[in-house]
């Protein structure tokens, strides 16, 4: 089993992509932006100009790419454990200040979120500005989650259930732990916005509507995309069911059942492991360079396929006419243009054919 196949999912399943073909689409193509060292995410704050992006590398670096020039904004490789599903996994920015948050696994195998201040040009972190704002002990090396997003004045993040199979510690349903949760930073504390998540690796807010889309990686039966309308995001209401449910199927794990007062919420869309093995949540396209794709949700699978769907229903799915090997993330720049990230190194921009 190749380590890249173990990254995120911990499960290798042979993919029968033909079983998932909906409507073929030749309208979207890819163009290579560049190659990086095990990239896992592309992000960009609204205060950068043009096509500038920041690439998060699993080994511990954040690299800015601006007009063809690369700058290492942050290098914390000596603090990061990057084996298996660990590493520097996510970054995001304050849209109003030169502030960046990063999420990584430290050398003890535990999760950290750290806030850094940037110089005025956003080209490097200010020395000594790092401040830890989240500590979470990880009992296993897999199911680390996680994405960071800044939305409506708050920082959000996700954590997996702590790892192993069948959530042996029943953490996703335990309201007293941060594991298996979607969290929101309220002042100096973290509020649990949603729970019952297995490994919410990649998720996003629709920049126009505020709706939330979560790609939650499954165990043996289902890959799922969970949907929360903007009107419900601010309230801790959603229980996505793990490990009592895997998608819309009752799980075979021994468990204590559902806990807490949240509303059991089934996926907006799911697929089984004859189709793929690790869902990669994406973005609703709101850019200008692919006008026919506006309002469509782009997502994919670690096995390499990419799809788009109607953002509200996740129906009317289109197959993109190319693959990205070891697809680990989608990204969005300040203008809403989309990127696809391969753990093998390439970062691609999605463009009209």
Language model features by range: what are they?
Residues 53-74:
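Beta-propeller domains
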Residues 9-19:
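Bacterial N-terminal signal peptides
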Residues 112-149:
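Asp-box/WD-like beta-propeller blade repeats and closely related beta-sheet repeat scaffolds
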Residues 315-334:
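Conserved blade-ending motifs and adjacent loop-strand segments that build the rim/top face
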Residues 31-37, 74-83, 134-140, 191-196, ...:
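Surface loop/turn motifs at the tips and blade-to-blade linkers of beta-strand repeat domains
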Residues 41, 90, 147, 199-202, ...:
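Conserved beta-strand position repeated once per blade in WD40 beta-propeller domains
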């Amino acid at each position: 089993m190749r380590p890249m196949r173990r990254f995120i999912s911990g499960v290798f399943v042979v993919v029968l992509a033909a079983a998932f073909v909906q409507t073929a689409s030749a309208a979207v193509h890819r163009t290579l932006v560049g190659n990086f060292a095990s990239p896992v995410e592309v992000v960009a704050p609204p205060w950068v100009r043009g096509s500038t992006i920041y690439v998060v590398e699993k080994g511990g670096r954040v690299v800015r790419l601006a007009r063809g020039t690369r700058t290492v904004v942050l290098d914390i490789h000596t603090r990061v454990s990057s084996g298996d599903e660990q590493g520097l996994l996510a970054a995001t920015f304050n849209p109003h200040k030169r502030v960046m948050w990063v999420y990584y696994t430290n050398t003890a195998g535990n999760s950290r979120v750290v806030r850094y201040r940037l110089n005025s040009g956003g080209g490097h972190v200010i020395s000594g500005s790092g401040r830890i704002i989240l500590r979470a002990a990880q009992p296993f090396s897999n199911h680390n989650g996680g994405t960071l997003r800044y939305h409506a004045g708050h920082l959000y993040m996700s954590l997996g259930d702590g790892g192993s199979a069948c959530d042996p510690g029943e953490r996703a349903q335990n309201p007293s732990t941060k594991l298996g949760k979607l969290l929101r930073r309220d002042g100096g504390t973290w509020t649990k916005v949603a729970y019952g998540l297995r490994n919410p690796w990649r998720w996003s807010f629709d920049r126009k509507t505020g709706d939330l889309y979560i790609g939650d990686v499954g165990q043996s039966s289902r890959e799922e995309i969970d949907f929360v309308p903007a009107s419900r995001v601010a309230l801790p209401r959603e229980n996505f069911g793990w490990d009592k449910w895997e998608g819309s199927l009752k799980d075979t794990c021994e468990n204590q059942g559902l806990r807490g007062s949240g509303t059991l919420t089934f996926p907006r869309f799911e697929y089984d492991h004859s189709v793929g093995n690790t869902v990669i949540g994406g973005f609703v396209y709101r850019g200008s360079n692919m006008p026919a794709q506006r309002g469509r949700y782009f997502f994919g699978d670690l096995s390499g396929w990419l799809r788009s769907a109607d953002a509200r229903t996740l129906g009317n799915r289109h197959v993109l006419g190319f693959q990205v090997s070891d697809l680990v993330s989608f990204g969005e720049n300040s203008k809403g243009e989309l990127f696809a990230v391969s753990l093998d190194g390439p970062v691609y921009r999605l463009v009209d054919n």
